[in-house]
Amino acid sequence: MLDLKQYEVWFITGSQHLYGPETLEQVAKHSQIIAAGLDQSSTIPVRVVFKPVLKTPDEIYNLVLEANAAKNCIGLVAWMHTFSPAKMWIAGLRSLQKPLAHLHTQFNSEIPWSEIDMDFMNLNQAAHGDREFGFIVSRMRLERKVIVGHWQDSEVHDRIAAWTRAAAAWHDAQGARFARFGDNMREVAVTEGDKVNAQMRLGYSVSGYGVGDLVRFVNEVSDADIDSTLQEYAEQYELAAGLQAGGEQHHSLREAARIELGLRYFLEHGNFKGFTTTFEDLHGLVQLPGLGPQRLMDRGYGFAGEGDWKTAALVRAMKVMSAGLNGGTSFMEDYTYHFGSNGMKVLGAHMLEICPSIAATKPRLEVHPLGIGGKADPVRMVFDAKTGPAVNASIVEMGNRLRLINSVVDAVETDQPLPKLPVARALWLPQPDLKTAAAAWIYAGGAHHTGFSFDLTSEHLADFAEIAGMEYLQIDRNTNVQQFKQELRWNDLYYHLAKGL
């Protein structure tokens, strides 16, 4: 499972020698206290590490090089306790390869009205010191997150936490490998894309494999490993009649376990962080992998169907961002609509592969026919998803840029039971309503595959898109279709011109 405590962000404070050793000692002391306070926050999932106060261009530049090379450092949190002339920061910021957050705070929460003097004023200058730093970062057109408020406020911790989760996902993507079994679902457009461009911009690589490469691992799975996995199934899930040992469909369950283990061994052997399958490339497999992808997603792997490598990478990023939370994150597809008088809703599902982390109750293992793929009836988990606020996101390629589209939704219970629907599913109300949300999504070119999460918010996704240099579009309760279309037009112009700015 994913553990974000292995990562750290460095808390860096800017000042200058002008203030003298006594003031600089106070700056360092205050910075250590703030860093320790953030590090001890139960909200922030990574370590926050104090670094010595930066007073010269060389100190700044060398610190940035150190951060770039540090494997566990996923970003910098900068603060100007005093005034730190920003030309000192140019060389360092120009070399920075890690995400940057700017914490606009001060050590004291209130003005000490009866005690304030010029010593206090000279020490506590973040109100204008951070403005100087903000200018140079904007002048250099560097992306960063600006967080304003007192460092002890819970809201500030929440905003830092969201950014650190996004930074962790970005860090995880650098050098990540994704396996694509078979190719794209034939003639589908949105799941295609420029994998070289994705590696250049997002850091991960996508490698294609014939299904025979997977089949070799599947065929090498031992009976003992299958027996052990079947015991896990019996402990974690309800088993439909016929799947228990000696049942008429027990062989299907053993085959599902064999495929799951083969997939897992392949991914572990190649150090992959996610994968795709497609029902059009199944030669040598008895079933379409269904239960295996469900359980592997639950372990933190990214997954998408039909060769959709962009969504598999997005699901992995969302899994990393949501590590340690308990709401759940899954691959998803907008499947069918309810245009009912009691609220227009979307029923989300897929052929088989929805992650059990979003299940409302204990999943049930069932075997049912699958009309595509031409293989034996596959095993899958069947369940209803949880309810509550969620995000439903897609990454698409627009030629000159990658676009992340986020639809904010509210998952609800189904109006009635679904006894004949043999797949896991989620039902939601898109914000502000289905007509507006669907129109905006279609105008934006959003895919039919998504990453769906109860753990993440729009802030996480916006932070991730900003770090990754992706266009970000949000569909929520404030969306107006005409204004959204204008935003699309403005963005087209911006991204056409931005490289020349």
UniProtKB/Swiss-Prot annotation:
Q: Where does Mn(2+) bind?
A: 306, 333, 350, 449
Q: Which reaction does it catalyse?
A: beta-L-arabinopyranose = L-ribulose
InterPro entries registered for this protein in UniProt: Ara_Isoase_C, AraA_central, AraA_N, AraA_N_sf, Fuc/Ara_isomerase_C, Fucose_isomerase_N/cen_sf, Lara_isomerase
User: What are this entry's molecular-function GO terms?
Assistant: L-arabinose isomerase activity; manganese ion binding
Please cite one Gene Ontology biological process associated with this protein. L-arabinose catabolic process to xylulose 5-phosphate
Q: Does the keyword Transcription regulation apply?
A: no
What EC identifiers does the entry list? 5.3.1.4
Q: Is the Transcription regulation keyword given for this protein?
A: no
Q: How is the cofactor bound?
A: Binds 1 Mn(2+) ion per subunit.
The protein's matches in CDD domains, at most eight in alphabetical order, are given as: L-arabinose_isomerase
Q: What class of enzyme is it?
A: isomerase
Keywords noted in UniProt: Arabinose catabolism, Carbohydrate metabolism, Isomerase, Manganese, Metal-binding
**Pfam families attached to this UniProt entry:** AraA_central, AraA_N, Arabinose_Iso_C
Show the GO cellular component annotation of the record: cytosol
Cofactor(s) essential for the protein: Mn(2+)
Please name the pathway.
Carbohydrate degradation; L-arabinose degradation via L-ribulose; D-xylulose 5-phosphate from L-arabinose (bacterial route): step 1/3
Q: What does this protein do?
A: Catalyzes the conversion of L-arabinose to L-ribulose.
What is the similarity comment for this entry? Belongs to the arabinose isomerase family.
Write the protein's name: L-arabinose isomerase
